[in-house]
Amino acid sequence: MLEVLQESLRKAPIVIRGEYPYFIHPISDGIPSLEPELLDEIADHMIDIAGKDYDRIVSIEAMGIPLATVLSMKTGKPMSIVRKRQYGLEGEVILSQSTGYSKGELYINGISKGETVLVVDDVISTGGTLKALLPALENMGANICNVIVVISRGDGAAKMSDMGYNVNTLVKIDVDMDGVSILEVAGEQQ
């Protein structure tokens, strides 16, 4: 299960950001190359989890864009991208987010009250992005049917659970200077 994803994670190079070992991967960074087989495998698994009973796919710039795009094409559902810059459109919602290595504002456009949304993202580490995004979507009147993240690292998914949000993850990993260790695949320990 998710063999292409697992193999690509095992081959991921590790760099140090401050004191933080950081893995470089096509899903989280877009480099070295985001292959169609990897996107296809991930999208099919996300569809298996979420089905198609929602109105819109919501994801976060930048690396949520390829995930949302392939899901949109496979399901025929429209997508909205939460951006990192302001457009000043009517109804735009601004939220502050803080991740394990950055802080900033996010801008939500194109989501209507009463819509049922599927939220997808590339990685959850601290949970900072989803901690800001999910309540904001609910405050806008959106119904969140599911949250799916490709890669879980750290305790972010557990923190979201403590807030009442179930985050489905495709793989849970640990990263050190020796590389990426795969701890769980689709909820099953390895």
Curated annotation (Swiss-Prot):
Recorded hits in SUPFAM superfamilies, A to Z, give: PRTase-like
Pathway, per record: Purine metabolism; IMP biosynthesis via salvage pathway; IMP from hypoxanthine: step 1/1
Subcellular localization is given as: Cytoplasm
One matching Pfam family: Pribosyltran
Q: Sorted alphabetically, which InterPro entries does this protein's record hold? A: HGPRTase-like, PRibTrfase_dom, PRTase-like, Pur/Pyrimidine_PRTase
Could you tell me the EC number(s) of this protein? 2.4.2.8
For the keyword Glycosyltransferase, the answer is yes
Q: Which GO terms describe its cellular component?
A: cytoplasm
Q: What Gene Ontology molecular-function terms does this entry list?
A: guanine phosphoribosyltransferase activity; hypoxanthine phosphoribosyltransferase activity
Glycosyltransferase found in the keyword field: yes
Which keywords fit this entry according to its UniProt record? Cytoplasm, Glycosyltransferase, Purine salvage, Transferase
Tell me which Gene Ontology terms the entry assigns under biological process.
IMP salvage; purine ribonucleoside salvage
The catalysed reaction is:
IMP + diphosphate = hypoxanthine + 5-phospho-alpha-D-ribose 1-diphosphate; GMP + diphosphate = guanine + 5-phospho-alpha-D-ribose 1-diphosphate
Q: Looking at its record, which EC class is this enzyme?
A: transferase
Q: Which NCBIfam families match?
A: HPT_Archaea (NF040646), PRK02304.1-4 (NF002635)
What quaternary arrangement does the UniProt entry report?
Homodimer.
Family to which this protein belongs: Belongs to the purine/pyrimidine phosphoribosyltransferase family. Archaeal HPRT subfamily.
Q: What does the record give as the function of this protein?
A: Catalyzes a salvage reaction resulting in the formation of IMP that is energically less costly than de novo synthesis.
Identification of the protein by name: Hypoxanthine/guanine phosphoribosyltransferase
